[in-house]
């Protein structure tokens, strides 16, 4: 804190890491927030501070969400999974009633509100019954559990230590114990809720896969940034989806070569997972990375987002694989299907590089209703 004080003086300042897993506070900010320590906050303590900073008038927030949702529809996005700490199904139903929900939304729940979510009686993917004509676009999501931290904050829980890694052995930390994780998933199971587990390090991923195996329910691992060979093969066998964010590769490739140089060839193993039969889902993890579906597809295919050479090109997806992983593995429009369609002006199979990344939607349709049109 004192180092930041020298630059900021008595004005309260909090610098939040791009990965959101750490924050740096000066003394004035610590005093204002009522926290103690050296000013460097990691994981839950940092999340708690960010939650305090994010407090805003609900009507203002709903307006922002509506604007962002409309912008997402223009990019060709038809659905999102909301993993904010403080959101809920009722909030999104009200936004839908107010005309601020042009997307399908699955609303995740954190352990602190798990019992409340179970009491609602909605399974993951199930929409509540409303007075609105037709089915709601809002549905219950999974239980979200943060199992470890991030590479940049040096809290990702790994098999092996890394430079300045957190934890007693320098290999990162577990945000929830394996025993507690199994307990949480079993509780979610009673309410027919799946689990989406944040796991960046290979030790975290292994423990999550172990928990899925013990409990016998399906779900996803969010990020799966570094994996052992053995665990790559376990995803398909257990029916676990790998929810990955290609744009993190652009953000993390340089840091990976420094901090995880001994395991860089085991990071962002998109091709290996597909070859092993894993269901891959491409996403953004916004606001950590931009909401940029075609940019993510470009990186998944080319393993670079700029003019630098491909980073570990052996893990590149084909364009067909990347598009499939971006559309919930729906590859064709069929009678009785959900009616979610986008139209683009150029054939993506004729494009590469910035041209592919720059694609936007000329027409976005959700459930048969036009949600964005540039035609």
Task: State each model region's role.
Residues 1-107, 134-189, 364:
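Catalytic pocket of metal/acid-base enzymes, prominently hydrolases
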Residues 90-95, 117-125, 205-215, 234:
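Distinct, well-ordered alpha-helical segments
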Residues 21-23, 79-81, 87-91, 113-117, ...:
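Flexible loop/turn segments at secondary-structure boundaries
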Residues 77-78, 192-193, 240:
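A structural motif
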Residues 63, 185-196, 200-219, 223-224, ...:
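His/Asp/Glu-enriched, well-ordered alpha-helical/loop segment
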Residues 353-375:
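P-loop/Walker A phosphate-binding loop and immediately adjacent motor/lid segment at beta-alpha junctions
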Residues 16, 82-83, 104-110, 141-146, ...:
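A cross-family glycoside hydrolase active-site/sugar-binding cleft signature
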Residues 28-37, 116-142, 227-241:
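Short amphipathic alpha-helices and their capping/turn segments at secondary-structure boundaries
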């Amino acid at each position: 804190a004192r180092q930041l004080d020298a630059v900021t003086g008595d004005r309260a300042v909090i610098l939040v890491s791009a990965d959101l897993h750490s924050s740096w506070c000066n003394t004035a900010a610590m005093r204002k927030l009522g926290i103690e320590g050296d000013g460097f906050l990691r994981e839950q303590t940092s999340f708690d501070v960010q939650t305090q900073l994010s407090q805003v008038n609900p009507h203002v927030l709903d307006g922002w969400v509506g604007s962002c949702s409309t912008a997402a529809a223009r990019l060709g996005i038809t659905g999102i999974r909301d993993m904010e700490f403080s959101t809920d199904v009722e909030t999104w139903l009200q936004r839908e009633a107010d005309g601020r929900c042009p997307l399908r939304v699955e609303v995740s729940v954190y352990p602190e509100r798990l019992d409340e979510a179970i009491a609602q009686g909605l399974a993951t993917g199930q929409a509540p019954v409303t007075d609105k004509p037709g089915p709601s676009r809002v549905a219950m999501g999974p239980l979200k559990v943060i199992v470890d931290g991030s590479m940049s904050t040096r809290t990702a829980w790994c098999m092996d230590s890394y430079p300045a890694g957190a934890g007693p052995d320098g290999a990162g930390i577990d945000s929830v114990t394996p025993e507690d994780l199994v307990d949480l998933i079993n509780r979610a199971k009673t309410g027919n809720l799946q689990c989406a587990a944040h796991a960046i390090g290979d030790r975290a991923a292994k423990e999550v896969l172990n928990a899925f195996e013990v409990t016998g329910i399906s779900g996803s691992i969010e990020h799966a940034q570094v994996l052992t060979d053995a665990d790559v093969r376990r995803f398909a066998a257990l029916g676990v989806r790998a929810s990955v964010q290609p744009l993190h590769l652009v953000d993390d490739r340089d840091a990976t070569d420094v901090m995880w140089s001994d395991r860089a060839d085991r990071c962002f193993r998109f091709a290996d997972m597909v070859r092993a039969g894993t269901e891959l889902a491409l996403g953004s993890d916004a606001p950590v990375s931009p909401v940029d579906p075609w940019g993510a597809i470009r990186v998944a295919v080319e393993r670079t987002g700029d003019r630098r050479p491909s980073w570990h090109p052996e893990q590149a997806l084909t364009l067909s694989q990347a598009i499939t992983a971006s559309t919930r593995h729906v590859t064709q429009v069929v009678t009785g299907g959900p009616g979610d369609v986008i139209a683009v002006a150029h054939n993506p199979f004729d494009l590469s590089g910035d041209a592919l990344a720059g694609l936007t939607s000329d027409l976005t349709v959700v459930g048969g209703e036009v949600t964005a049109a540039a035609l």
